[in-house]
């Protein structure tokens, strides 16, 4: 895939996206399309990004019975996206079905979209895990278990906090992707995410791709913020 920086386009409409992308004209990005944008604009927004030369992570976090996920992935594969995801909590058979659907739906001669599994959302903390989700194991152990299950199910990697990337690499190997949201500059608000790190720390912890949204999309100068991201990832001292 392309750059290690995945820009989360959490906008409600195509118009808002176009306004944001204007300063990046001619610069191929790796963009994340989540539920908010995809449910409003549908497959047409994916086609627009691909025509502009951007890589696309379609972040719908599928979690359903295996056959439903298989058929959904079969359709998503035809869109030409580069990366999709499911919830690891859906279990091994569901994750295997996701890969089966992608294999069946990918056009002849095209590369199958990579598929990663969400371990635990970066808005989840130990209290929520135990008291609300009723999972007794510690957060790190739960993430590690889900990562191993995802790998055994044929996933290409996981979505995890950068704080768990080292643990996952040790258990699953260097080639197993760690895609890490919850990325903020040191002087940013953490908003609704509780497990956050800076770009430079994420790289040091073993992240392959970092997902960053509001720090770029809500910046007064998004292009300058993106340049700062590149600088910090490469060891710059602005943190």
Curated annotation (Swiss-Prot):
Catalytic center residues: 61 (proton donor)
Superkingdom per UniProt: Bacteria
Keywords: Decarboxylase, Lyase, Pyrimidine biosynthesis
Entry-linked InterPro entries: Aldolase_TIM, OMPdecase, OMPdecase_AS, OMPdecase_bac, OMPdeCOase_dom, RibuloseP-bd_barrel
Enzyme class: lyase
Subunit structure: Homodimer.
Annotated function: Catalyzes the decarboxylation of orotidine 5'-monophosphate (OMP) to uridine 5'-monophosphate (UMP).
Family membership noted in the UniProt record: Belongs to the OMP decarboxylase family. Type 1 subfamily.
PANTHER family xref list: OROTIDINE 5'-PHOSPHATE DECARBOXYLASE
Name of this chain's protein: Orotidine 5'-phosphate decarboxylase
Gene coding for it: pyrF
